[in-house]
Amino acid sequence: GMDGLLTIRPDGKVYIQQGVGNLGTGSVFDTARAAMEALQTDWEQAEVVWGDTSKHLPWSSVQAGSMTTHAHTRANWAAGLDAKSKLQEIAARDLGGTPSSYDVADGRVFRRGNRSQGMTFARAAERAIALGGKYDGHEVPEDINDMTKTAGGALAGLGLMGIAKDNFETGGRNMSYAIGFAEVEVDLETGGVELKDYKVSSDAGTILNPRTFAAQLHGGGIQGFGHARGQKWV
C-alpha cells in the first residue's frame, strides 16, 4: 500500500500532504477527505498540500489504471486513524483514563459521555510538540517508504503527526463497472450514423465527489462515441 501523511498544527488545522498530482479531476483533494472522515472533522478545517517533492510529500501511486482513488483514500484513512489514536493517547495522558475513553470529532478530542472534558486540535498539537517522539514526527514507523520518512523528518516538530502505511486487507482486486446503451439511426445508403440517445449505469461503490463521478461517466461515453464513429480497421 501507499503512505499517508498529515500534521495537526497549533493553528488547529489539519495539513494533509498529497503525493498525487492534479490532473483536473480533483482527486488530489477528494482522496484527502478520507483523513478528515477518520477524524470526524469538517472539511473546512483541512489544508491540502500538493505539488513537487519540495513540499514534503509521501510515497504515492502513479495516476493510471484506476489506482488513485483506491490507493489514496486508503492511505489517507490510515494517516487519519494514526492521528486519531495519538489524539486519544494525549488526552488520556493529560486528562486521565485510557485512550479508549476518548473520542474525536469536530476538531476536538473529548471524553466519551462528557464532551466538555477534552481539548481542541490546536491544544493537542501543542502537547504533541512538547511530548516529541512519535507524536510530533521525530519517530516514524519502520514500514513506510524512505520518501515518506524524509518528508516526515522535514515536518517533524510542526504539530501532531499522522503518518502510516496502508496495511489494510484488500479482499482481492476491486473494480468498478459501467455499462452504456446507445440508440442510433443508421442511413443504409450513405452509412451515416446519428446518435439519438445514450444511457449509462455504473456500480461504483462510495462516491467521493458527485460532480467528478458524473464527469467520469460522461467523459467515458464521449470517448466511446469517438472510438465507435471515428476509428476503423486498416
Regions found by a protein language model. Give the residues of each.
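Cofactor-binding beta-sheet edge motifs in enzyme active sites
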Residues: 1-234
